[in-house]
């Protein structure tokens, strides 16, 4: 493939119009402050890849979950590190994940849940404008996947006007 080839990181729905799916997508877009359905489809594709890998690992172990867990220990460790799985979860639990589990790990959602914005949209704006840091580094991508270890390190940039507790745009809870 040539350099700079256009590749999509998501799959679109098979059927262009299904009223129930469209309504569900609209609800998720408003609840998580997503700008367009491409962001949702990207999360769904990521979840699909996780489930595909879990099925492959379980299949290679012929249904033996202990052997599958040994083979997929790195895969499980990665999902536990980013907070999609809990410490006691196994490969079988990956198959029961939902797209909301992926969307909850986005920087935009974590910043909103921490109270850095009054709405998910406001948290997204603060991130995009460079007001939020993770581990002291400015991150301007709302789709950044937050590790469990980084969750406590999300805060306003000290040079940002929003770092002042009395700033009018700060969340009321702080």
UniProtKB/Swiss-Prot annotation:
Superkingdom of origin organism: Archaea
Keyword Repeat annotated: no
Residue ranges annotated for the S4 RNA-binding domain, each copy included: 105-169
Alphabetical UniProt keywords: Ribonucleoprotein, Ribosomal protein, RNA-binding, rRNA-binding
Cited SMART domains: Ribosomal_S4, S4
Gene3D superfamilies the UniProt entry points to: RNA-binding S4 domain
GO CC, alphabetical: small ribosomal subunit
Pfam families per UniProt: S4 (PF01479)
CDD domains noted in UniProt: S4
Single GO term (MF): rRNA binding
GO biological process, one term: translation
Function: One of the primary rRNA binding proteins, it binds directly to 16S rRNA where it nucleates assembly of the body of the 30S subunit. With S5 and S12 plays an important role in translational accuracy.
Subunit structure: Part of the 30S ribosomal subunit. Contacts protein S5. The interaction surface between S4 and S5 is involved in control of translational fidelity.
Protein family: Belongs to the universal ribosomal protein uS4 family.
Protein name (database record): Small ribosomal subunit protein uS4
Biological source species: Natronomonas pharaonis (strain ATCC 35678 / DSM 2160 / CIP 103997 / JCM 8858 / NBRC 14720 / NCIMB 2260 / Gabara)
